[in-house]
């Protein structure tokens, strides 16, 4: 199975190698020289220069191979900290001082350990703490990488913005240069063979324009220089900040790993001797490249630490492989969740737009509902006014009927008047007969108690007045006495009043029927609740028109009632007037 173990790479100016070579040749990558006599002394004066920590793949040795481990350290040319740790192959020595080149070197370990110690137990609770620390370190490293990516993206965007501004400024500079050249050409044309006052003024204007253009060009150059300097500063800051952040995170993770492994006795038991320096200076002792004094990496390189069993190494490797898979799955899940969040934000934006539209429609519906409520309130008020008008018209009709009933005794009075006119034509001897009906109540008037309708009253008036009118027209004689004139005027007035009463009664009865029908229809419409807004508006318009027409029709009802009352008063005063001429005669 593929196993992965966390290793530390210490990067400095050189990469040193530790361990005994297989052929007995002393390796130049040893860190501490061996003391004579086989006695080892602890390493002293080792200076640390830590750069970064990265995660590397480790391949376990085959079952048929001896315990000669080979440590292969590589560094990419892009200054990244990702390397492969090959423990199964040997590679030739190579070292370099440049940080942008690849460094590699073999590192061998002796097979049997110097002092075997008890391997760590699988059930040790510190393994869980170690794995949790590794997991938290991986999460923090992932967070730092994510933050660095975001900052790099922002800086790149800012750099692109500055580049676009620089390009715009360069275009403006080129344009100003062309304008200056054109102005110089125009100025040279103006300085022709006839330099008069106008030409000199134009030359001065052109000179001022050229000076202004030069000033603007200088300002643009200064701005461009400032922008370029700012761009370089941002790039330098980005390049300086990224390694520092990675170095701090990886150093913290390495310290936790070393602390966890040192508790299990994996530290070095014997110091390690160094070997010759780099190829450039063979006499100078090599400087350790940030190796910890009690770290796991030094124990492995020196080969003096206890060897772990195959099963424990496989467990640790499988656990770290699972951690790596979990980190990758977490990263993939984070990207998926980010996409889901973006989609949710887009959906929320669309929902917000729809909600704004719905709120606008709801406000319009509320305004329309308020208008409908006001219209219904006005309709109720007008219906109440219509009911009061109908009541007034009913009262007017009742008074008119009472007045018409009071006109019942008109027929005997007219007959008596006709007889008196005939007697007045016969001679003055019959004048005294007119006083007789005035002395007491008329027997016909006393016996006449029945009620006459409007049609019968009209017929009686026509039969009573027609012979008198015909006789007056035929003779063409003016009445001789004042009593005849008064009687004639009273007859004409009674005829006009009777006709007016009849017409008014017919109009009032028809108007009353219409008003009752419209009132019933208005009440039915008001009782109808389940109506659409459009139907309510149409119904309100229709009711408004109908109410206006009814108001116009019923506006004359109080006037007609008062007229009827006046007519009744005049009619009630007719019998006393009838006795007046008799007394005068």
From Swiss-Prot:
Residues 91-108 have a biased composition (Low complexity). It comes from Rattus norvegicus (Rat). GO terms for molecular function: protein kinase binding. It holds the Pfam family TSKS. This is Testis-specific serine kinase substrate. May play a role in testicular physiology, most probably in the process of spermatogenesis or spermatid development. The modification Phosphoserine is found at residues 224, 281, 309. Phosphorylated on serine residue(s) by STK22A/TSSK1 and STK22B/TSSK2. It is found in: Cytoplasm, Cytoskeleton, Microtubule organizing center, Centrosome, Centriole. PANTHER family: TESTIS-SPECIFIC SERINE KINASE SUBSTRATE (PTHR14351:SF1). Its main location: cytoplasm. GO terms for cellular component: centriole; cytoplasm. Residues 91-126, 262-309, 559-585 are annotated as: Disordered. Keywords: Cytoplasm, Cytoskeleton, Phosphoprotein.
